[in-house]
């Protein structure tokens, strides 16, 4: 009888692990406690993966994790966790307050007689990338649109033509992070007339 060769039982290829990532802080849930958004991370995990939540955050799991610590270390860990949570809440409140106060200015500017451009400033406060928004404006209104630097140090989007009302509607419709109340329409021509009237009077 002929010998039949048996394949050698060598090392198999390593298998990939499936890792769950937190929807709030984007870390694996086991590491959420080191970030500043622990409470939000816990809520997210409880809604999306109850089994993992019970394994990490159940009272039994927490007690087992802190059992080896001394009383002083437990108190210190608790104090640190409260401090981190308070700091994260304060940062979030500050960011929300900043967004409330931020204003997007859509200004119609007269260049020559009956020729206008529309400038849009303040969108970067809402986390929008100006180059992408300028490209969207150009596509939507079939006109030239570019990001330019302002003398005060910031940047604005300049769109060819008088499209200020349409831009306001487009921003409200497409970019939900920008509240309609925070968009201000300004007509530069009227301002020039007012300045001329006050100078003459």
Swiss-Prot record:
Q: Does the keyword Cytoplasm apply?
A: yes
Q: What Gene Ontology terms describe where this protein resides (cellular component)?
A: cytoplasm; ribonucleoprotein complex; ribosome
- Enumerate the GO terms in the molecular function aspect: mRNA binding; translation initiation factor activity
Where is the protein situated, by its record's location annotation? Cytoplasm
Q: Which UniProt keywords apply?
A: Cytoplasm, Ribonucleoprotein, Ribosomal protein
Q: Which PROSITE patterns match?
A: SUI1
Coiled-coil ranges from the UniProt annotation: none
Subunit info here reads:
Interacts with the 40S ribosomal subunit.
What protein is this chain from?
A: Translation machinery-associated protein 22
């Amino acid at each position: 009888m002929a010998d039949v060769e048996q394949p050698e039982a060598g090392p198999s290829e390593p298998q990939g692990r499936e890792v769950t990532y937190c929807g709030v802080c984007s870390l694996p849930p086991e590491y959420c406690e080191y970030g500043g958004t622990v409470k939000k991370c816990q809520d997210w995990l409880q809604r999306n993966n109850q089994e993992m939540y019970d394994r990490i955050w159940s009272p039994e799991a927490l007690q087992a994790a802190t059992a080896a610590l001394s009383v002083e270390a437990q108190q210190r860990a608790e104090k640190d966790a409260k401090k981190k949570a308070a700091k994260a809440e304060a940062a979030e409140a500050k960011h929300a307050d900043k967004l409330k106060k931020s204003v997007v200015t859509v200004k119609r500017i007269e260049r020559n007689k009956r020729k206008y451009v529309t400038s849009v400033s303040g969108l970067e406060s809402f986390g929008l990338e100006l180059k992408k928004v300028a490209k969207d404006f150009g596509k939507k209104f079939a006109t030239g649109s570019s990001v330019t630097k302002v003398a005060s140090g910031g940047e604005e989007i300049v769109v060819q033509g008088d499209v200020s009302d349409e831009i306001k509607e487009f921003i409200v419709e497409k970019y939900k992070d920008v509240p309609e109340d925070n968009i201000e329409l300004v007509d530069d021509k009227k301002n020039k007339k007012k300045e001329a009237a006050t100078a003459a009077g």
